[in-house]
C-alpha cells in the first residue's frame, strides 16, 4: 500500500526530531498548530535558545533541495505562529528559525535559515 503524504511527513518530522535530540536539543513540542495562523513542525531548546524548526522532505533534488521549498509565504506563517507562541508562553529567551532538509538518506540542518526582521506584519 502506498504511504500517505501525511504519514511520510510525520515520519520525516520524527526523523528530524531524533536528529536534534542527538545534538542534545530538548524537544518541547512537535506539530504545534495555531489556527488559523499556522503550524510549526518542531519547537526545541538549544541551550538557552528556543528554536522553531521547519522540516522539508523531498524524494530527489531534481527540482532543488528540500530547503528551497520553504517559501517566503511559509516563512512568514512560521514566524507569525512562533511570535504568538512566544507571547502566549511568556518566553524571554532568544529565538531562532531553522530548517531541516531531508532528501534520501541525507539530513541538512540550516541554523538561522530565516529571521523575523526580514518581514513586516
Report residues per predicted region.
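Mg2+/Mn2+-dependent nuclease catalytic core
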Residues: 59-79, 84
Amino acid at each position: 500500500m502506498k504511504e500517505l503524504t501525511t504519514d511520510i511527513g510525520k515520519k520525516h518530522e520524527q526523523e528530524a526530531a531524533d536528529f536534534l535530540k542527538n545534538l542534545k536539543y530538548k524537544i518541547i513540542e512537535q506539530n504545534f498548530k495555531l489556527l488559523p495562523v499556522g503550524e510549526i513542525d518542531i519547537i526545541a531548546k538549544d541551550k538557552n535558545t528556543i528554536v522553531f524548526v521547519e522540516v522539508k522532505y523531498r524524494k530527489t533534488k531534481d527540482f532543488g533541495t528540500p530547503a528551497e521549498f520553504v517559501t517566503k509565504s511559509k516563512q512568514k506563517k512560521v514566524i507569525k505562529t512562533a511570535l504568538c507562541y512566544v507571547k502566549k508562553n511568556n518566553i524571554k529567551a532568544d529565538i531562532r528559525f531553522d530548517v531541516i532538509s531531508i532528501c534520501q538518506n541525507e539530513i541538512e540542518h540550516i541554523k538561522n535559515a530565516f529571521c523575523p526582521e526580514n518581514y513586516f506584519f
